[in-house]
Amino acid sequence: MSSKQPSLSYKDAGVDIDAGEALVERIKGVAKRTARPEVMGGLGGFGALCEIPAGYKQPVLVSGTDGVGTKLRLALNLNKHDSIGQDLVAMCVNDLVVCGAEPLFFLDYYATGKLNVDVAATVVTGIGAGCELAGCSLVGGETAEMPGMYEGEDYDLAGFCVGVVEKAEIIDGSRVQAGDALIALPSSGPHSNGYSLIRKIIEVSGADIEQVQLDGKPLADLLMAPTRIYVKPLLQLIKQTGAVKAMAHITGGGLLDNIPRVLPDNAQAVIDVASWNRPAVFDWLQEQGNVDETEMHRVLNCGVGMVICVAQSDAEKALEVLRAAGEQPWQIGRIETCGADAERVVLNNLKNH
């Protein structure tokens, strides 16, 4: 009887090369739909090539990377993978546009224990849809099948984006001054932040989020609503008015932590929380988790996805341009002068909870 060891393959070790190749074939069309004229070549090369768009005198490249946090765990639990790709793109491109940059190209990293081609193709299709909304090209990515690193078909995502801005037109908050107006753009829900708290609240409440209805929609759908991509309306606002002094993408840390990132040292944002109706999903989360009002604004966006600073004299024009671009903006507050030790963001009219 032979004791010869059987011949092992990569597939025996848990890595299916054929599945990886099948995925690449399925997503080629997705990438092609996002192609910008500056992109040279398609998927499959060792590196992706992209020219700087014409018309820039002193182009500055802007880069960013992000993930979607534990919203991904919720997506896996619900077996809902069609919009998480848009979340990934949004988290990256919204960070780029706040300095005035136009997103050029995007790459993704998809890591999994066992590659499910259908799930991965659905995720990448969502990434492609996000790239189309942002006007950037999906130029490549990495699909890593890593048995033993992830449980079964669980996966993780990361995104990487590069954009370009004219050096003289970089928006950095340095011109912000007392009296300026703050304009808000609505979020679609929690976007991609605060999901560790959200998942804990769901656990503590014992709620079946697919059965709970808020405003006629299942809570699961409200929690999985894709992160809004603000790129096109904001670039339109910048181009048409030249009035934007600063922008803050309201992500993890909420209004309290994100607005100060774009303010000069002596500036304070005074926000009127009563200026908008908070979406019902946030009220449900606060009630079920007995979450303190300040904590809500430090963890969640509470209905505000982007804040824009313009001179008060430009506020009406900015609101007009944003409405014409399909947005529903409103004035959320103003800038005041403050001392070195003052709170950088003051929230007025907080609800008593």
From Swiss-Prot:
A Gene Ontology biological process term: 'de novo' IMP biosynthetic process
GO cellular component terms listed in the entry, alphabetical order: cytosol
E.C. code: 6.3.3.1
Catalytic activity: 2-formamido-N(1)-(5-O-phospho-beta-D-ribosyl)acetamidine + ATP = 5-amino-1-(5-phospho-beta-D-ribosyl)imidazole + ADP + phosphate + H(+)
Gene3D superfamilies: PurM-like C-terminal domain, PurM-like, N-terminal domain
Location in the cell: Cytoplasm
Group of enzyme by EC: ligase
The keyword Cytoplasm belongs to this UniProt entry's keyword annotation: yes
Major location (coarse): cytoplasm
Lineage: Bacteria, Pseudomonadati, Pseudomonadota, Gammaproteobacteria, Pseudomonadales
Domain of life, per lineage: Bacteria
Family membership noted in the UniProt record: Belongs to the AIR synthase family.
Pfam families, alphabetized: AIRS, AIRS_C
Pathway note: Purine metabolism; IMP biosynthesis via de novo pathway; 5-amino-1-(5-phospho-D-ribosyl)imidazole from N(2)-formyl-N(1)-(5-phospho-D-ribosyl)glycinamide: step 2/2
Species whose genome carries this gene: Pseudomonas aeruginosa (strain LESB58)
GO MF annotations, alphabetized: ATP binding; phosphoribosylamine-glycine ligase activity; phosphoribosylformylglycinamidine cyclo-ligase activity
Protein name as it appears in the record: Phosphoribosylformylglycinamidine cyclo-ligase
Recorded name of the encoding gene: purM
UniProt entry keywords in alphabetical sequence: ATP-binding, Cytoplasm, Ligase, Nucleotide-binding, Purine biosynthesis
SUPFAM superfamilies per UniProt: PurM C-terminal domain-like, PurM N-terminal domain-like
